[in-house]
């Protein structure tokens, strides 16, 4: 089976989401050696944001070399996603949402006829059967029931987007409060890794 591993944190070595996404992938591979892993670091190799030229080229308009290269990058991203059985995404919360690098990747996936279609009764997701696991880190506490829950446009957005594509199995391995001191940070990471181990079992 194929596993797509995505990282989007700009924090590098100190990134909690990178630590957690790597842990999730390691646990999955430990449980099943047959995984074929494709890795994309959206910070080391960022995708450009959508342009009018890119959209026009997808519809058959003439394109210069730069736009053709951009289209090729988008098609490669789409192929990786469509081929994957499981997608593990390192997605920190930045300013209540997701990193712009991750948003650029997501924008390459929302393509009518590829990942969703419009039917008689509205949009229909075409990616049923896939599984998404999100390694989520937040400096504060934003989970349901917290005073800041209404500001969560990170996990809620990802849940909505992948659900729109027809993916029903979406899990979050969450470390919250990682900016609230070393003790809270350590406990949050340990709890997230414990949850990851249960998901991979």
From Swiss-Prot:
Cofactor binding, note field: Binds 1 FMN per subunit.
Q: What is its EC number?
A: 1.6.5.-, 1.7.1.17
Organism, scientific name: Bradyrhizobium sp. (strain BTAi1 / ATCC BAA-1182)
Give the reaction(s) catalysed: 2 a quinone + NADH + H(+) = 2 a 1,4-benzosemiquinone + NAD(+); N,N-dimethyl-1,4-phenylenediamine + anthranilate + 2 NAD(+) = 2-(4-dimethylaminophenyl)diazenylbenzoate + 2 NADH + 2 H(+)
Q: Which protein, by its recorded name, is this?
A: FMN-dependent NADH:quinone oxidoreductase
CC cofactor: FMN
Which residues participate in FMN binding?
9, 93-96
Q: What are the protein's GO molecular function terms? A: electron transfer activity; FMN binding; oxidoreductase activity, acting on NAD(P)H as acceptor; oxidoreductase activity, acting on NAD(P)H, quinone or similar compound as acceptor
Q: Which Pfam families match?
A: Flavodoxin_2
Q: Which family, according to the similarity comment? A: Belongs to the azoreductase type 1 family.
> Gene3D superfamilies, per this entry?
3.40.50.360
Q: What is the annotated quaternary arrangement, including any partners?
A: Homodimer.
Source superkingdom: Bacteria
Record keywords: Flavoprotein, FMN, NAD, Oxidoreductase
What this protein is reported to do is described as: Quinone reductase that provides resistance to thiol-specific stress caused by electrophilic quinones.
SUPFAM superfamilies in the cross-refs: Flavoproteins
């Amino acid at each position: 089976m194929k596993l797509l591993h995505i990282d989007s944190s700009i924090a590098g070595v100190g990134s909690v989401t990178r630590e957690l996404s790597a842990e999730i992938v390691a646990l999955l591979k430990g449980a099943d050696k047959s995984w074929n892993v494709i890795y994309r670091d959206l910070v080391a190799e960022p995708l450009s944001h959508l342009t009018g030229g890119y959209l026009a080229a997808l519809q058959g308009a003439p394109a210069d070399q730069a736009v053709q290269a951009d289209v090729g990058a988008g098609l490669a991203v789409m192929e990786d996603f469509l081929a994957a059985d499981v997608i593990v995404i390192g997605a920190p919360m930045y300013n209540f949402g997701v990193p712009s690098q991750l948003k650029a990747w997501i924008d390459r996936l929302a393509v009518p006829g590829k990942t969703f279609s419009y039917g008689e009764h509205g949009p229909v997701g075409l990616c049923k059967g896939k599984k998404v696991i999100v390694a989520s880190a937040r400096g504060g506490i934003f989970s349901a029931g917290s005073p800041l829950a209404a500001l969560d446009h990170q996990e809620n957005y990802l849940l909505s987007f992948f659900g729109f594509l027809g993916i029903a199995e979406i899990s979050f391995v969450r470390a919250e409060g990682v900016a609230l001191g070393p003790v809270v940070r350590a406990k949050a990471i340990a709890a997230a890794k414990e949850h990851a181990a249960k998901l991979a079992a």
